[in-house]
Amino acid sequence: MRKIVHVDMDAFYASVEQRDDPGLRGKPVVVAWRGARSVVCAASYEARTFGIRSAMPAVRAERLCPNAIFVPPDFVRYKAVSRQVREIFHRHTDLVEPLSLDEAYLDVTQAKTGMQLATEIAQLIRTQIREETELTASAGIAPNKFLAKIASDWRKPDGQFVIAPSRIDAFLLPLKVNRIPGVGKVMDGKLAALGIVTVADLRLRPLEELQAHFGSFGQSLYRRARGIDERPVEPDQDVQSVSSEDTFSEDLALDALDTHILRLAEKTWLATRRTERIGRTVVLKLKTSNFRILTRSCTPEQPPVSQEALAQIALALTRRVELPAQTRYRLVGVGLSGFSNVEEGAVQGQLFGEIPQAE
């Protein structure tokens, strides 16, 4: 039986800002650029009490909390702290799979330290993070990645939760299906329309029925309802692509997608900055109302050097969609692929918006 730990830093970007500026502590902090098309990168727990969440439009966050303190993101600083945290992970196991700067899976089945109890390993990791970075992290401990990720949310912030193999059914069955990763508002609504509200409801449905309604995702739902997840922890995978998607509550015409594409381009650009790598190929993904998936891509001579350039290329790709004008779309996505490392110096400054200081 594997021992998997999912570690998730608490309000990471906002917590770094509060750590480094004592004047921000105890106040609603929103990490975001101001602007009509900006989205929230992170919100402190004080800001979350007003309903502010990551990926929310910044203008909405400002309406929810007019007194919120907006801080522009500093990904160079966040990356440096992330390296500190990752070094702590590697003291315990080489099987570390980063998901982003602020979370990772660890397989501690055979920990380097010789410690046997995954709960004790997780506690020690969280203690080391607190002592060495002055930040807090939460952890979930379980026999697989799916369960560990759910568990890490259970005692946030600054806590941990274990799902023992003997307790999987007792934990899973009462859960609302929207706690399953990948089940968002739209999917939750579709499941509810079928009378599926809890994981217990989901488990009663045969695989064939779920596949008929949800295609390949139906198989994933079937397995997750049984707590099954055989995916291994894959150490330090290089990023091959970054993308953001929106699924709509109502199907939209192609010409109604522009505002969504602009917002998704910003989310994708922010995610790309976190990797400190260059994506050369722009990808537009569409799903029609009858679940047909289309992708269009473009690899310009020079990679997009700004969020605006990425957005313009993605918008241009909509003109390469050759479907009847009456076609309606239920999903749009914007992505970057074909990654390479950012050059040091001037190129990095050009790509990631750093303005050289006059000497």
UniProtKB/Swiss-Prot annotation:
Keywords: Cytoplasm, DNA damage, DNA repair, DNA replication, DNA-binding, DNA-directed DNA polymerase, Magnesium, Metal-binding, Mutator protein, Nucleotidyltransferase, Transferase. It is found in: Cytoplasm. GO terms for biological process: DNA-templated DNA replication; error-prone translesion synthesis; SOS response. Its EC number is 2.7.7.7. GO terms for cellular component: cytosol. The record marks 13 as: Substrate discrimination. Residues 4-184 form the UmuC domain. Its main location: cytoplasm. Its cofactor is Mg(2+). It comes from the Bacteria. Pfam families: IMS, IMS_C, IMS_HHH_1. NCBIfam families: PRK02406.1. Belongs to the DNA polymerase type-Y family. Monomer. PANTHER family: DNA POLYMERASE KAPPA, DNA REPAIR POLYMERASE UMUC / TRANSFERASE FAMILY MEMBER. This is DNA polymerase IV. The gene is dinB.
